[in-house]
Regions:
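N-terminal lobe/hinge region of extracytoplasmic solute-binding protein
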Residues: 1-41, 159-161, 165
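Surface-exposed binding/hinge segments that line
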Residues: 47-49, 64-68, 75-148, 152-157, ...
Length: 549
């Protein structure tokens, strides 16, 4: 949701998207940039000219310069501020890692020869670099306000460049000692956006944002049933979260509600992750057996069946590969219900099957810690996962947690298996799936997303102060680098497709089970309706409201 508000309404990065559904919504186009960049023949230099007349909103009133873009990326490279997004840029821009580590006082690969020009020098050709620059993290930030924050917290003081701003932004102030957070943003409670008076529509591309509303009000509500009761009553206009089975049944069975349920391709995947450093999942044959035996059909039905998506059989959403892996299923079973016979055959090859009976019968196969979410549908999946793995001798010790991510993202916790994760692309390219989730160089002690620990080396383990993997775990870092350097083409698609196949057959870090749709519920008054393929949310940039409906 944050990506949607930032890219649709609040911020103007160099590049952006049209915020519509389908392939057209995945095409990157200039926003703050006046035109597409000049790219050197070797693909290592990108030169952008900024659009004139784009101004920061209150409390500032000045034109955006190239230095504001460079400063935003300096923040991305600052470990205390960059969240997870630094990886996308430090792996691409020359000198960014040196800046992040404190070895350099500036980023050598970013030049701002004048206020209207910014030049990037890359470490290697990067086929999706324009899409990385379209992420909100790369949108301009004014140093006079952003520089007041050496730790996270700037979000409540965000200075807008888009058509909307946070209510109360005009009262933030510009002196670090006197800053007051914008009244319209109360984290985890509410967000109110109003028109940015400094936004000039003549500087904008109307295909990016229509900006039809005068005001947006977002309320955070933990009672899911209350959200959908209010949506049905028409007292709220958008319910973008995941509706439960009872809500889905009402909206699909009642003619008066049917048109208000929108089913979109969400470019997202739900999966079970196995930690390659923890027994018994440190044996690839156990991981393959777990894939063979899992009843994916039952798992998908707990989510609500085909309306929620289709059974996933590999890592990347099919739309990202132009269908190159449609039909690829290395662990095929009848109706996706699991194949105990083939699972047992695979288990017999494992060192954890000591009796050669197709069962995991070593001590490591008992009381295997499984971290799950405590709310539906994950809580309803637990019995299916336990029952499936019990067929190959693995007994789980399931530990439900309201905040499962806080547990599994801490590397020292050594969680062997978790059914909590899902992933939605950060931008429409396979690098934002495979590159981000499986690059060993992106394993971090806090906020780790490579739960399987693919690519963990002895050196990295030492840096993280965790035991070195024994036996060593496989790495796909070289394959990621090869695919990332390939320019957009059939060859790039083929490269990622082959790497996906290798992940699922040789590395086997996941049991993917649901290639998920995005379900959005709206009131009758939302007209026109549009979906934003980039953010995977309703298109706040283009929807309108008609109270006569």
């Amino acid at each position: 949701m944050g990506f949607a508000f930032l890219s649709n309404l609040l911020m103007r990065p160099l590049m952006n998207y049209r915020h519509v559904a389908g392939d057209a919504g995945n095409e990157v186009i200039p926003d703050l940039a006046a035109r597409m960049p000049e790219i050197s023949q070797d693909g290592l230099t990108y030169e952008f000219t900024l659009r004139r007349g784009v101004r920061f909103g209150p409390p500032l009133d000045r034109e955006v310069t190239s230095r504001d873009v460079a400063y935003a990326l300096e923040r991305v490279a600052t470990p205390s501020l960059g969240a997870r997004y630094g990886f996308y840029f430090m792996s691409a821009i020359e000198g960014m890692s040196d800046y992040a580590s404190g070895q350099a006082s500036s980023i050598s690969g970013i030049e701002t020869p004048d206020d209207d020009t910014i030049v990037f020098h890359l470490l290697q050709p990067t086929g999706d670099f324009l899409k990385r620059l379209a992420m909100p993290a790369a949108a301009p930030i004014p140093e006079e306000v952003g520089g007041c924050f050496t730790e996270p917290g700037y979000g409540r003081y965000l200075v807008a460049t888009g058509p909307y701003m946070i209510k109360g932004s005009d009262s933030i102030g510009t002196e670090c000692d006197d800053l007051e957070p914008a009244a319209g943003f109360a984290p985890n409670r509410r967000l109110t956006l109003v028109r940015n008076p400094n936004f000039d529509f003549s500087t904008d591309d109307p295909t990016i944002r229509s900006a039809r509303f005068q005001r947006y009000e977002l309320t955070v509500e933990s009672d899911i049933s209350k959200i959908y009761r209010r949506a049905e009553a028409g007292t709220i206009d958008i319910a973008p979260g995941g509706p439960g089975l009872d809500v889905i049944r009402r909206y699909t069975s009642r003619a008066s509600l049917r048109n208000n349920l929108h089913v979109e391709s969400g470019d997202r995947l739900w999966y079970i992750s196995m930690n390659l450093t923890q027994p018994p999942f440190d044996d690839v044959h156990v991981r393959r057996a777990a894939n063979f035996v899992m009843d994916k059909d039952f798992l998908v039905r707990t989510w609500g069946g085909s309306l929620q998506g289709s059974v996933a059989t590999h890592v990347l959403p099919d739309d990202m590969l132009d269908g190159a892996l449609e039909g690829f299923d290395p662990y095929r079973s009848r109706h996706h219900a699991g194949d105990v016979r083939r699972a047992a055959q695979e288990m017999r090859l494992s060192r954890y099957d000591r009796n050669d009976d197709g069962l995991c019968d070593a001590d490591a196969c008992r009381d295997v810690v499984h971290v799950a979410r405590s709310s539906p549908p994950w809580s309803e999946m637990t019995g299916i996962i336990e029952s499936s793995l019990r067929k190959i001798g693995i007994e789980l010790d399931t530990r439900p947690n309201d905040d499962a991510y806080s547990v599994i993202q801490k590397v020292p916790n050594d969680i062997p298996i978790t059914s909590a994760p899902g992933w939605v692309k950060d931008y429409p390219d396979p690098f934002s799936f495979i590159g981000f989730l499986f690059d060993g160089r992106n394993i971090r002690k806090p906020a780790n997303t490579n739960y399987a620990m693919v690519g963990l080396t002895e050196e990295l383990a030492e840096d993280l102060r965790i035991p070195a993997p024994d036996p060593p775990v496989p790495s796909i870092d070289a394959g990621i680098d090869r695919c990332a350097a390939t320019l957009p083409s059939r060859e790039r698609t083929k490269c990622w497709a082959e790497l996906d196949k290798s992940l699922m057959t040789k590395v086997v870090p996941w049991i993917p089970y649901l290639a998920a749709n995005k379900l959005v519920i709206t009131s009758d008054a939302i007209s026109p309706y549009e979906f934003d393929q980039f953010s995977g949310e309703i298109s706040f940039a283009h929807i309108g409201i008609d109270r006569s409906l």
